[in-house]
């Protein structure tokens, strides 16, 4: 997998993972549910290459808290000529206690590279928030699409979404935007960086 996919985001994932929760669900009188994403990976023509790395880490729930972590819908495709399509998705669940509810969705993620000399990279990291005292924290990692279709195309996208904190019947909703990144025609190039942080 190309190193560019992991720059910055791998560091974020490791730091967040150690800070928030270990790789397994932590439950002490709570419920933690984790879905690892739908993941699809395709590479077809010529010098095509489609890489995909998806990591989903469960959150922690205690004292009747509930944590639901969904690792995104992830799709990755590279079809023609000198195509390359990367994709790196990391979703880390949040922390719920005292009847708090935390929902973390890793975005809808799609990554495509189609035609001649195309290249599309995508990196998405979604970190769930925390909730306690009947609070609810909802974090959505954006709708994310990344495309490079024709000629000398190249498209780059990086999205980070950090959830917030909800306490005492509070509600905290963080959505990482509707993100779309495209480079379509002759000599095209497109780059996008999105950061969304809750409190």
For each predicted feature, which ranges?
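C-terminal segment of classical bacterial N-terminal signal peptides
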Residues: 14-23
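Bacterial N-terminal signal peptides that target proteins for export
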Residues: 1-10
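Low-complexity repeat regions of mature extracellularly deployed or surface/particle-associated proteins
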Residues: 23-199
């Amino acid at each position: 997998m190309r190193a560019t996919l992991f720059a910055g985001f791998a560091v974020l994932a490791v730091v967040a993972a150690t800070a928030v929760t270990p790789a397994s669900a932590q439950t002490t009188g709570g419920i933690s549910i984790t879905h690892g994403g739908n993941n699809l990976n395709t590479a077809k023509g010529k010098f095509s290459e489609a890489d995909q790395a998806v990591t989903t880490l469960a959150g922690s729930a205690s004292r009747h808290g509930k944590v639901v972590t969904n690792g995104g819908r992830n799709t990755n495709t590279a079809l023609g000529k000198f195509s390359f399509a990367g994709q790196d998705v990391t979703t880390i669940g949040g922390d719920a206690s005292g009847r708090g509810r935390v929902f973390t969705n890793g975005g809808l993620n799609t990554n495509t590279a189609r035609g001649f000399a195309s290249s599309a990279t995508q990196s998405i990291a979604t970190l769930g928030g925390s909730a306690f005292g009947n609070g609810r924290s909802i974090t959505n990692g954006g709708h994310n699409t990344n495309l490079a279709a024709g000629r000398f195309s190249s498209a780059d996208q990086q999205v980070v979404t950090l959830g917030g904190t909800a306490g005492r019947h509070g509600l905290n909703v963080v959505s990482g935007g509707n993100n779309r990144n495209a480079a379509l025609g002759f000599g095209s190039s497109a780059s996008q960086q999105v950061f969304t942080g809750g409190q």
